[in-house]
UniProtKB/Swiss-Prot annotation:
This is Probable arogenate/prephenate dehydrogenase. Transmembrane segments: none annotated. It is an enzyme of class 1 (oxidoreductase). GO terms for molecular function: NAD+ binding; prephenate dehydrogenase (NAD+) activity; prephenate dehydrogenase (NADP+) activity. It comes from Methanocaldococcus jannaschii (strain ATCC 43067 / DSM 2661 / JAL-1 / JCM 10045 / NBRC 100440) (Methanococcus jannaschii).
Length: 446
């Protein structure tokens, strides 16, 4: 696709995943139009992303070579019926909702002859940095699979590093009924159960096994999302009803077995489930072990950094903070920044030390320096000394002097030592002079 020649209209592109695609595609050189009901928000997005905004869906559909419907699931069918008839012949209509049978049927029924339809489900959220290694599901009919537009979209996604899966919309909704529907239903039910039992989540974590920690984290992640989106996933997938009934029946059966103290019955169900999983049971154990290890090793790593210089990077905003890691309290780390304490949620930051810290300092901070003059005997090769010190400091020689006021048989070497703040330079100077003394030098003056 020649990006600069194509206009992509994103219906609902002022928020969520629609806005994500607006930014991503604009950065790839496409002309992008976004629509939304909130004019003030739309104008802000227009300015922020450098795209065109209109609150007229039909106008945007008429202009787009590619039209992407990116509205909430509960209004997707209505919006498709509104815009599909206005997509020009020879152009492409897509949607990016997480159900596929309803939008696929609506698009097929309401487009003109000669318009290609590619229902699409990106399996990621708007916090994802790029398409690299992300799953994107395409559900075109056979008619639209054998088109130039399909090849262009497929090849673009592959070129961007996405994992592209092509399946019929019916199969998609059956699979998503499990992958999203059952998963969300189970974890939201768990969260609601903990609420009904009035469980103090923070208190319970003090007694938690690693698996409980993982479960609580997953529940928290899911129930902290947009509840309307999750409601629509449950209510608009035609396959969900059967899945719910099966899940609830299994819960009732296991509950009855426990109530009757039927130990063998319980063992039978668990063994049969494990047999059904086959090798995936061991794979699940392996991945959960890795997740547990990651949780514990992260805390161990942070404990070893207490009292040391670190960089703390917010994984959402990418803002970087520098300071000394003072302590870890529950889910928070405490950073001493120039004498002031600041708390950061461990789950929302990355912590850097060593070489990674040095790279971040070079990128984000302005260098400062001190000059320190030391005396060495005349026959000492200052380049050898410098090469040794470079392994420990950001340092250079700015002067070598053997004239007046220099002790006989000695020469003065002035080093310029770099750092990023007064406290750091003070510590560096102390360490520097200690090393100088141990290799036969002595301080002259600063």
């Amino acid at each position: 696709m020649k990006n600069t020649n194509l206009t992509i209209s994103i219906i609902g592109g002022t928020d969520g995943l629609g806005k994500w695609f607006a930014r991503y595609l604009k950065n790839k050189g496409f002309n992008v139009i976004v629509t939304g009901r909130d004019i003030e928000k739309g104008k802000n997005v227009e300015k922020e992303l450098g795209v065109e905004f209109t609150n007229n869906n039909i106008e945007a559909a008429k202009k787009g070579d590619i039209v992407i419907v990116a509205v909430p699931i509960n209004v997707t069918e209505r919006v498709i019926k509104e815009v599909a008839p206005h997509v020009r012949e020879g152009c492409l209509l897509m949607d990016i909702t997480s159900i596929k049978e309803i939008p696929s049927k609506a698009m097929e029924e309401h487009v003109k002859e000669g318009v290609t339809v590619i229902p699409t489900h990106p399996m990621f959220g708007p916090s994802t940095p790029s398409l690299l290694r992300q799953v994107v599901i395409l559900t075109p009919s056979e008619k639209h699979k054998n088109t130039e537009w399909f090849n262009k979209v497929y090849n673009f996604l592959k070129k961007e590093g996405a994992k592209v899966i092509v399946i019929p919309p019916e199969k998609h909704d059956r699979i998503m009924g499990i992958v999203q529907g059952l998963t969300h239903f189970a974890f939201i039910s768990l969260g609601a159960t903990l609420k009904e039992l009035n469980v103090d989540i923070k208190e319970s974590r003090k007694f938690a096994s690693p698996i409980y920690e993982l479960m609580i984290s997953i529940i928290g992640r899911i129930i902290g999302q947009n509840p309307y989106l999750y409601a629509d996933i449950q209510m608009f997938n035609p396959r969900i009803k059967e899945i719910h009934e099966t899940f609830i029946n299994q819960c009732k059966e296991i509950s009855e077995i426990v109530k009757n103290k039927d130990r063998e019955g319980f063992v039978k169900i668990m063994k049969e489930a494990a047999k059904h999983f086959g090798s995936e049971a061991k794979r699940g154990a392996y991945y959960s072990d890795k997740a547990v290890f990651a949780l514990t090793s992260e805390i161990e790593k942070l404990n070893k950094l207490i009292g040391k210089d670190v960089a703390v990077k917010n994984i959402n905003s990418n803002v970087v903070h520098f300071g000394v890691l003072k302590d870890i309290e529950d889910d928070y780390l405490i950073l001493n920044k120039n004498g002031k304490e600041q708390k950061f949620n461990i789950l929302r930051v990355e912590v850097f030390a060593g070489d990674e810290l040095s790279k971040l300092k070079k990128k984000h901070l302005e260098k400062k320096y001190i000059d320190v003059s030391v005396l060495f005997k005349k026959d000492v090769d200052e380049e050898v000394i410098l090469n040794l010190l470079k392994k420990m400091f950001d340092i250079e020689i700015i002067d070598v002097y053997e004239g007046e006021k220099i002790e006989e048989g000695y020469k003065s070497i002035t080093f310029r030592i770099y750092g990023y703040n007064k406290d750091e330079l003070k510590n560096i100077e102390k360490e520097f002079l200690k090393i100088i003394k141990n290799i036969g030098g002595k301080e002259r003056f600063k």
